[in-house]
């Protein structure tokens, strides 16, 4: 009886875990976001060949975040990270108008994968500090997010270097994880 009570309490009050896959085109700011969340500071980054993985503790949730490189040659490897992913963070460089269609195509290709059918989608419209950045509404339109009828999604304006918007995104993820468990 005591064990059952302890398990019930830990389910209610214990730390939840969430596996997050963070992807996007190269130079969108994925690694900067990861280490801003993990360390609270800006780190010097180089293009990610392969992946970085860190655990980010936030609001009683342990987010295991896999940051996977976004160069076109290694995007086919993204699918190797899909299994058991509960949340997908897709990072977009809001200032890169020339590649937003490419970003849309990669996002929709990924979302068609069966292994990601239950994953919630958080889009970080990053680099909002730049003067010509597209706002969240424009990114929503250009990525075709309204067409995702069977997918639970949210878009958050962010600036990885200042940290603006990052924790609001994690709030959305944590609330949606709580609703799914």
From Swiss-Prot:
Family, as annotated: Belongs to the small GTPase superfamily. Arf family.
E.C. numbers: 3.6.5.2
Keyword flag Mitochondrion: no
Residues carrying lipid (N-myristoyl glycine): 2
Domain of life: Eukaryota
CDD domains, per the entry: Arf1_5_like
Enzyme class: hydrolase
Catalysis performed (reactions): GTP + H2O = GDP + phosphate + H(+)
UniProt keyword annotations, A-Z: ER-Golgi transport, Golgi apparatus, GTP-binding, Hydrolase, Lipoprotein, Myristate, Nucleotide-binding, Protein transport, Transport
A GO cellular component entry from the record: Golgi apparatus
Protein name per UniProt: ADP-ribosylation factor 1
SMART domains: ARF, RAB, SAR
GO biological process: protein transport; vesicle-mediated transport
Main location: Golgi
Localization per Swiss-Prot or TrEMBL: Golgi apparatus
One Pfam family it belongs to: Arf
Positions bound to GTP: 24-31, 67-71, 126-129
Gene that produces this protein: ARF1
